[in-house]
């Protein structure tokens, strides 16, 4: 840059080219006194700073350049300060500039101290001239920093020292900008480089100053107003925490500004100061809060519109204790700290929150536009359900009850919610399986929109704890509670249930209506328990766990559902063995309606092994689920149903309970779920199952179509697979067709286990076993007369075959099998509470009529207490607990119920249902059932009872092969068979005890009977061979 000499002339018209924003119209500026002096220093400054303070006279080229440059720079840089903000201080008109200079000199006398001089020559200037020249230059050179630097305490030199590099770079480029391609831009860039550190320093200083002020402020601002101001400022500066739900939940419990330190933390203070500076807000004024905005911030998604819980802490006077006003709605909760907070995100789940449950469901249709928001739904059909509801609570209009509706159990997410929640028009389950809810039926069990009509209030998925379907039925209230609620609805459900039945043949498993989640664990059977549905679908039955259980996948849950303490260990394997067995829980739903243990046993009705019947179970147990698990489908279901109260029935976990079997029996309809009468009587689901070609046969129906997953799948097993197997027959017998499976011999539809004749036609368990055993078609007269009489004669007299100790795997399980659950099925189907007798193991020959049973030797002297070893005739295979179809593994001594009057193909299933014991027993039942082939009737009861292929089959098939040499060996085969079968076992719904049917047998014979049943194990005799083959094939 042409050296601009520091001559007075040069200084006369100093061009503050140094500052890119400066316009060099210095020729317009009037000369100032002392120009020469200032010029001396200034010229140097101009040169050194490349501000090109060039004398217009001497350096016209320079001046011209500077003119040009500054016009450009002024145009470009003048509008921008170091950080890009428009600089208004560089008005380079002569008047404006002079005024600016004067202003700078007058107001910013300390600029010289605060801002680094453009050149080191400044230090040599005289104080006065130098100050004037410096100020003049500085005003043009550093206008953007005048305001920020005005308050600075450090001198420019110090600042330069702090950031010498940026300043030096800027100086360098300012000097050489003329030689650079992008001169103005480079100068501006270097200026910015220098300015940044200055700004940073300025912020730091201001922060420090603010911090010091804030530290001293608390002592000074002792007045209430000062405190309020502070509190308000804090509130403003501190954005409300959107995640702070507690504030909104209960303001009383929230710490208020009073609890906060009045002195903001340094960070807070600096932030506040910055905010005030940015917003030009003054600390002197108490900010008036826009409460609406704050409230909007605090709006919490809610399932139901509710008064906001204002975070009073966010208000100016939040620190003041809130005065309780009687008129305040939320004061009640405030006054009563013990009361649960009425939070929108309370555990009460929005009934209509569309969640994963409503995947295929039309929540609106299902719920009839039910919304938690619309209490008007009281008038909706749910009202109808309440009308039928015996409880005033339900009649109150629970459907509109926000609490219930939103409660997790009623949430759309839960299969059972709608049923429980009156929110559904027809039934709490209207959404899931309401007549409207064909979608439910079609949709997967877990429909996202199950109970979430769009109309519902704010649905807060995040804030509202939604019980998960998977969790099961009792999310918040326990399945039973819901059931109780549903029970009242049952009448409504009946009407609804019919429609529902068409839509949802299955329970949670196959049932779109009900999420499978509910199916597994909850003793949803209690839903089935609500016999209120009797004629109609029991909402409980519909969406009950059992539904899930119905479905093969659910069956495992079902097993859990029926896990009765100790029984589970031996049955754990079995629990999943047959989904249908497990599904028996679903029977609970339908059975009450059906009153038929056979219906209860329907879960057994289908063979989980059948590909169409239980996908989950089939996958898990390709050969068929282990039959060890008490075929709750048969017995367990029955016992579940036996629980007269569907509410209670869901929980009846002990097979020993006189499950509803007797109740079911009293309602004896054709046992087959497919039985039209039953379907009418039973849940619509049951009917649906019957009608559905894919529905399992009677079993499904019995298990109340809801849970009849099989209804959705072909019941029949693969043509070649297990044709002889009871399970396959049962599942396949009528499953493939929409019509309920009917025994081609006795025409019963309720057998616990379906078998096939050589032609592949379905036979009930009794007929199938009889045919296999004797090679002759079972005489229909035998169905009730002969077998029944036998049961009465021997079974009735016998209190309980011995204690059916659940024989886990081995005779090793002695009479006192680890879980020797001596469950007294107090009443069998006969309702005669047989004396609960623990027959010494020796008394009862444990026979594993089924492979599964054999797996656990009779050692579960549960059957007879006789271990395989103890019974000479019983071998390990026959060791399976003889005590009943319950299950070879665990035979639980169950007081034999008086023989039921329902012998015959269905009788077996009934008797199976009749006696229910813990899972153990169930298993034992299975094994016993397998083991209990003593007679066709017995087989029917026990074999049906046991749905596990081996056990179930064993019950039926093995039964036929009683080992004369077994405990019953002394008895003639016929006697054994009659004993095993008679013992009131047949009449009794198939007791889980299975051969425990032996329960019905005379005391002496009970063990023997058990033994006989067990003795009819593999090798039990020639008949055993056929029977064994039968049960073996069935257990495949």
Curated annotation (Swiss-Prot):
Sequence repeats lie at residues 49-55, 87-92, 105-110. A zinc finger (GATA-type) spans 743-767. Residues 1-17, 45-56, 100-114, 703-714, 828-861, 868-899, 1000-1023 have a biased composition (Low complexity). It comes from the Eukaryota. PROSITE patterns: GATA_ZN_FINGER_1, GATA_ZN_FINGER_2. Interacts with nmr. This is Nitrogen catabolic enzyme regulatory protein.
């Amino acid at each position: 840059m042409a050296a601009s000499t520091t001559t007075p002339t040069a200084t006369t018209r100093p061009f503050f080219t140094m500052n890119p924003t400066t316009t060099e119209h210095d020729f317009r500026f009037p000369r100032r006194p002392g120009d020469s002096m200032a010029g001396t220093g200034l010229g140097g400054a101009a040169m050194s700073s490349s501000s090109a303070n060039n004398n217009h006279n001497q350096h016209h080229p320079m001046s011209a350049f500077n003119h040009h440059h500054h016009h450009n720079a002024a145009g470009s840089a003048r509008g921008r300060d170091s950080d890009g903000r428009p600089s208004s201080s560089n008005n380079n008109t002569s008047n404006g500039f002079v005024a600016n200079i004067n202003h700078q000199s007058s107001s910013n006398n300390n600029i010289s101290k605060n801002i680094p001089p453009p050149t080191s020559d400044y230090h040599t200037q005289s104080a006065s001239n130098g100050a004037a020249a410096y100020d003049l230059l500085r005003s043009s050179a550093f206008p953007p920093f005048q305001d920020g630097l005005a308050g600075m305490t450090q001198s420019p030199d110090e600042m330069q020292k702090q950031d010498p590099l940026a300043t030096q770079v800027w100086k360098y480029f300012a000097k050489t900008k003329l030689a650079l391609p992008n001169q103005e831009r480079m100068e501006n860039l270097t200026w910015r480089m220098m300015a940044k550190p200055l700004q940073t320093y300025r912020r730091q200083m201001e922060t420090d100053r603010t911090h010091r002020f804030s530290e001293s402020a608390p002592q000074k601002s002792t007045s209430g107003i000062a405190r309020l101001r502070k509190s308000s400022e804090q509130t403003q500066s501190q954005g409300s925490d959107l995640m702070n739900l507690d504030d909104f939940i209960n303001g009383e419990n929230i710490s208020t500004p009073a609890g906060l330190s009045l002195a903001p933390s340094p960070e807070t203070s600096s932030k506040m100061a910055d905010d005030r500076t940015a917003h030009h807000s003054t600390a002197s004024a108490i900010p008036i809060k826009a409460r609406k905005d704050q409230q909007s911030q605090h709006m919490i998604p809610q399932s139901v519109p509710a008064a906001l819980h204002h975070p009073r802490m966010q208000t100016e006077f939040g620190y003041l204790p809130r005065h309780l006003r009687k008129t305040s709605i939320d004061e009640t909760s405030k006054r009563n700290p013990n009361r649960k907070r009425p939070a929108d995100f309370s555990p009460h789940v929005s009934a209509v929150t569309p969640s994963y449950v409503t995947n295929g469901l039309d929540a609106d249709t299902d719920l009839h536009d039910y919304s938690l928001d619309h209490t008007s739904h009281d008038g909706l059909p749910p009202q109808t359900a309440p009308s039928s509801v015996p409880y005033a609570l339900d009649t109150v209009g629970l459907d509109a009850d926000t609490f219930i509706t939103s409660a997790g159990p009623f949430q759309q997410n839960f299969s059972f919610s709608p049923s429980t929640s009156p929110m559904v028009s027809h039934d709490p389950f209207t959404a899931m399986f309401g007549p409207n809810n064909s979608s439910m039926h079609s949709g997967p069990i877990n429909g996202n929109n199950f109970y979430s009509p769009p109309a519902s209030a704010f649905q807060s998925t995040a804030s509202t704890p939604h019980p998960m379907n998977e969790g099961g039925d009792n999310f918040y209230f326990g399945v039973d509670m819901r059931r109780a609620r549903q029970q009242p609805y049952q009448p409504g459900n009946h009407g609804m249930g019919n429609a529902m039945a068409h839509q949802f043949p299955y329970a949670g498993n196959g049932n779109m209506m009900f999420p499978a989640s509910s199916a597994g664990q909850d003793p949803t059977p209690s839903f089935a328990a609500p016999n209120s549905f009797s004629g109609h679908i029991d909402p409980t039955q519909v969406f009950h766990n059992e539904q899930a259980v119905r479905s093969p996948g659910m069956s495992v849950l079902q097993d859990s559902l029926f896990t009765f303490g100790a029984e589970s260990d031996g049955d754990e394997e079995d629990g999943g063995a047959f989904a249908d067995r497990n599904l028996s829980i679903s029977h609970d739903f339908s059975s009450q309606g059906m009153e038929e243990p056979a219906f209860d046993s329907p879960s057994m009705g289908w063979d989980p092994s059948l590909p169409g019947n239980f996908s989950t179970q089939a996958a898990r147990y390709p050969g068929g689920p282990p039959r060890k698990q008490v075929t709750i489908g048969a017995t367990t279901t029955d016992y579940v149903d036996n629980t007269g109260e569907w509410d209670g029935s869901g929980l009846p976990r002990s097979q020993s309970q006189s499950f509803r079997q007797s109740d079911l029996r009293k309602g004896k309809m054709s046992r087959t779920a497919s039985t039209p009468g039953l379907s009418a009587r039973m849940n619509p689901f049951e009917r649906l199952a019957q009608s559905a070609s894919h529905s399992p046969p009677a079993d499904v129906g019995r298990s109340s179509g809801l849970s009849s997953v099989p209804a959705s799948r072909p019941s029949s097993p693969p043509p070649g697979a297990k044709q002889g197997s009871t399970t396959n027959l049962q599942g396949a017998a009528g499953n493939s067709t929409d019509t309920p499976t009917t025994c081609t011999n006795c025409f019963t539809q309720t057998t616990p286990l379906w078998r096939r004749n050589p032609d592949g036609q379905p036979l009930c368990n009794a007929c199938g076993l009889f045919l296999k055993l004797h090679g002759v078609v079972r005489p229909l007269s035998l169905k009730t007369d002969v077998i029944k009489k036998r049961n009465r004669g021997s079974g009735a007299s016998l209190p309980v075959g011995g204690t059916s100790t659940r024989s886990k795997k081995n005779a090793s399980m002695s009479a006192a099998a680890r879980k020797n659950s001596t469950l007294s099925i107090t009443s069998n189907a006969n309702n005669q509470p047989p004396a609960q007798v623990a027959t010494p193991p020796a008394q009862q020959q444990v026979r594993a009529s089924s492979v599964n049973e054999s797996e656990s030797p009779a050692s579960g002297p549960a059957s007879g207490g006789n271990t395989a070893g103890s019974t000479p005739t019983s071998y390990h295979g026959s060791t399976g607990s003889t005590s009943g179809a319950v299950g070879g593994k665990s035979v639980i001594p169950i007081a034999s119920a008086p023989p039921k009057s329902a012998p015959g193909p269905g009788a077996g299933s009934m008797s199976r249902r009749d006696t229910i014991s813990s899972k153990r027993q169930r298993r034992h039942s299975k094994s016993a059932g397998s083991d209990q082939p003593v007679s066709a009737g017995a087989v029917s009861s026990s074999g049906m009872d046991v749905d596990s292929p081996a056990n179930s089959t064993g019950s039926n098939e093995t039964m036929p092969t009683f080992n004369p040499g077994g405990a019953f060996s002394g008895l003639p085969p016929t006697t054994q068979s009659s004993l095993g079968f008679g013992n009131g076992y047949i009449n009794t719904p198939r007791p889980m005890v299975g051969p425990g049917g032996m329960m019905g047998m005379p005391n002496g014979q009970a063990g023997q009977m058990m033994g006989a049943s067990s003795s009819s194990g593999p090798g039990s005799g020639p008949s055993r061979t056929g029977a064994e083959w039968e049960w073996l094939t069935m257990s495949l």
